[in-house]
Amino acid sequence: MSKPIVLSGVQPSGELSIGNYLGALRQWQQMQDDYDCQYCVVDLHAITVRQDPKALHEATLDALAICLAVGVDPKKSTLFVQSHVPEHAQLGWLLNCYTQMGELSRMTQFKDKSARYANDVNVGLFGYPVLMAADILLYGAHQVPVGSDQKQHLELARDIATRFNNIYSPENPIFTIPEPYIPTVNARVMSLQDATKKMSKSDDNRKNVITLLEDPKSIIKKINKAQTDTETPPRIAHDWDNKAGISNLMGLYSAATGMSFEEIEAKYQGVEMYGPFKKDVGEALVAMLEPIQAEYHRIREDRGYMNEVMRQGADKASARAAETLKKVYEVVGFVGRP
């Protein structure tokens, strides 16, 4: 019996955060035995916001090395760089012709980013969700892990796929209609200084973010200064409505140690101050990240191995993507290349 196909991508823009790890990359490693996994470093998506070429080049290699360091196995999964598989851009253009302007103008992420990057509101940023649809539909993905900021894009991908199937192949659909992948444990990683906002690797205030490659001393310092509350006496309790800062730190501690919230609450019952708890959270995060960082540096220095991973991943992805694109071109009426 074939495994369900999953596709997920990571952007090589900015340093990846512990939010990226706990919310996505750790799932990637855990899903490999039960799913047919397609994992992609989405550099084509990254340039919808202006990038420094040298920084993008290095960030792409960094992201690939991090994927490998957290446990993505190229023998179990297909790991590739998006721009190495031209079918993504080819299908993306074609799907533009089956997407309405009104659909894209309603995308909240476009509204948010166009406000943030007001001097560079480009067509690529507007059509970002269509390229994401192409990423998904090329591989016949059954499930797509998505955060709250991407759910709307997945809905659009479903609409585009349904529309195309209804026009050209209602009896024998070309595109699989993807479903969201809902993890059994959902890591909620929020800003360290404002726990009402999601931790973002692109946050201008670096006190809000812990990166995967962050120096241990910096991690400890940021956790020590993280938001808590002024409740007297102090109370360690998981309560997002009333204790968002503490709940955020508890989530990080739970993710790093495997302890349940109930166990954490019991451990710190009757604390006189939040300092010892913060100290333990910082040390637990350092311990969680140390082996990942060591493996990352080992892999990053082995460019020959990385090149081989990229080459094999692109070959595997292209073979599958080309089959889908050929079917699409045929039903649309394109003349095949002799």
Swiss-Prot record:
Keyword Phosphoprotein tagged: no
Chain location of the short sequence motif 'KMSKS' region per the record: 198-202
Keywords: Aminoacyl-tRNA synthetase, ATP-binding, Cytoplasm, Ligase, Nucleotide-binding, Protein biosynthesis
One Gene Ontology biological process: tryptophanyl-tRNA aminoacylation
Binding residues for L-tryptophan: 135
Catalytic reaction equation(s): tRNA(Trp) + L-tryptophan + ATP = L-tryptophyl-tRNA(Trp) + AMP + diphosphate + H(+)
EC numbers for this chain: 6.1.1.2
SUPFAM superfamilies according to UniProt: Nucleotidylyl transferase
A GO MF label: ATP binding
Residues annotated to bind ATP: 11-13, 19-20, 147-149, 189, 198-202
Motif 'HIGH' region location, chain numbering: 12-20
Cell compartments where the protein resides: Cytoplasm
Pfam family, one: tRNA-synt_1b
GO annotations of cellular component type: cytosol
Family: Belongs to the class-I aminoacyl-tRNA synthetase family.
PANTHER family: TRYPTOPHAN--TRNA LIGASE, MITOCHONDRIAL (PTHR43766:SF1)
Complexes and interactors: Homodimer.
Function: Catalyzes the attachment of tryptophan to tRNA(Trp).
Protein name: Tryptophan--tRNA ligase
Species per Swiss-Prot/TrEMBL record: Vibrio vulnificus (strain YJ016)
Source taxonomy: Bacteria, Pseudomonadati, Pseudomonadota, Gammaproteobacteria, Vibrionales
